[in-house]
């Protein structure tokens, strides 16, 4: 037995631990009736800084081919930057400068959705990126800011937003149509996945730890995050999602991974921040920009 070999008992737990300290530990899950362990917990490392610090923008793409665009106020509101896995370079400028928007798609087929233009105007504008320039797309049915977004340029999804609202809209590459309403109206939330298999998590209801899953027509309750927060970022897909950063009672470094039913704590960000953007997957995520005590240009992989 393990006790005979190393002089220690194996803990018996009714549920799996959700903290990063579980890495390397062995326990017996009495509910599942099996021994379990965590061999590895994800970790963040520094990437190349953006050329312009910003917060409340949006992102799209992958860890090695990402897009950062928008911000609230200042010249950075129209700026786009492209990431190649090590550094950022200047891309085409948005036609409508804005922050508190949502993003979707890829570096060469991006989608900028809604947002807030100074001084305090909510916009329904959608723009499409082709790898070098932005052009106008179909307007949202309901103009909003502080919303979540995911999917692709030709199959996008927008959900939640100021109010807060429970409204969901689906994009086909030219026009938005109404989708199924969120179970709970919320804003400052994050999302991941596709138009027909998405997850929305966190946000302000007030601040929540809840997640919801979308099947292309309706939302159902998903797993509960370990850290309640808003103004966070997300990446991945519905069955393998990543939630990171945001604001709880203060800016947080917390990172969590979702397996389709449960959230588990993972390696923390080096820099606590809210209003950040994300891209990539659970195993190759990208966190960039945000607000610490000032706008940030930091990137983490």
Residue ranges and their predicted role:
Residues 1-301:
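Polar, enzyme-active/binding microenvironments
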């Amino acid at each position: 037995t393990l006790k005979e070999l190393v002089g220690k008992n194996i803990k018996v737990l009714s549920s799996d631990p959700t903290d990063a300290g579980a890495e390397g530990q062995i326990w017996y899950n009495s509910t599942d009736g099996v021994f379990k362990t965590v061999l590895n917990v994800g970790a963040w490392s520094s990437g190349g800084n953006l050329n312009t610090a910003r917060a409340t923008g949006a992102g799209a793409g992958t860890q090695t081919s990402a897009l950062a665009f928008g911000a609230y106020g200042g010249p950075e509101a129209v700026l786009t930057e492209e990431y190649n896995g090590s550094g950022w370079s200047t891309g085409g400028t948005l036609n409508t400068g804005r922050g508190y928007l949502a993003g979707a798609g890829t570096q060469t087929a991006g989608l900028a959705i809604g947002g807030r233009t100074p001084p305090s105007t909510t916009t329904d504008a959608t723009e499409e990126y082709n790898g070098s320039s932005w052009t106008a797309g179909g307007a949202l049915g309901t103009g909003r800011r502080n919303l979540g977004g995911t999917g692709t340029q030709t199959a996008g999804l927008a959900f939640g937003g100021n109010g807060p609202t429970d409204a969901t809209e689906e994009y086909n590459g030219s026009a938005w149509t109404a989708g199924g309403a969120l179970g709970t109206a919320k804003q400052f939330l994050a999302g991941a996945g596709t138009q027909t298999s998405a997850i929305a998590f966190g946000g302000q209801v007030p601040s929540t730890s809840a997640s919801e899953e979308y099947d292309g027509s309706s939302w159902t309750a998903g797993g509960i995050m370990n850290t309640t927060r808003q103004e966070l970022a997300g990446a991945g897909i519905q069955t393998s999602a990543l939630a990171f950063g945001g604001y709880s009672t203060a800016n947080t470094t917390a990172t969590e991974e979702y397996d389709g039913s449960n959230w588990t704590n993972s390696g923390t960000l080096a820099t606590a921040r809210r209003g950040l953007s994300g891209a990539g997957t659970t195993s190759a995520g990208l966190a960039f920009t945000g607000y610490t005590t000032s706008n940030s240009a930091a990137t983490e992989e």
